[in-house]
Amino acid sequence: MDRKTLSLLAVILVLCFFCSCSSHPEETLLKRYFSALSLNDNTTLSTMALEPTDISAESWEVLNVSEEVVEPFKLSDMNKAELDFKKQLEDHVGITLDARDVWDNTVYEEERARTRAAKRAAKAKADELKVKYDEVLDEHKELQKNYNEAKAAAAKEEEIATFSLGAGELPTVRDFTGEVFKKEVDIKTEGEAGVSNYRIYLRRYILRDEATGIHHRGRWIILKFENLS
């Protein structure tokens, strides 16, 4: 067997090794998780799961593993949406205050009116302006809701991404590009409380800092446990 053939076989063996190591990352992760759980090792648990869940189990087994889903990393878009809603909200503050002031002034005119006719006219005007103010206020509340939701969603995605990357704070992570890998694993556990079924949501982030060209290869993490039983 010549040197060229040996080199080719060596490459194939290395590739097979890495494939075998990475083909079932969920099993390795869950073995480590339940091992730490049995030892009450909260420190280790907190490095593997974003929201560690205490599961009382003497044994467990994997029932099903979903297909791996790959999606683009969208934190940059989420950050843009958050900033857009923030600007809309800030621009609407003045509009809301102006509508309130106009209504307040009309109510004041109604209180100062001396004749019944003047009071009726002022009240009719105040009622009309109150309806307009309520409409503007509802718009403002909707903008506030949209901003709060966009802000919370971006913050959550940033938290999950940095947890997977295991790099602590990354000030420019919202400008990163890359891919998000997702899996769902169904397991069955048995313990003193009986049999329980859980769905475990896994994530992994592989990102690139466009400013520096540095690649960040995240690890598989447990996003959350869902009790199915």
Predicted feature locations:
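Bacterial N-terminal signal peptides that target proteins for export
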Residues: 1-8
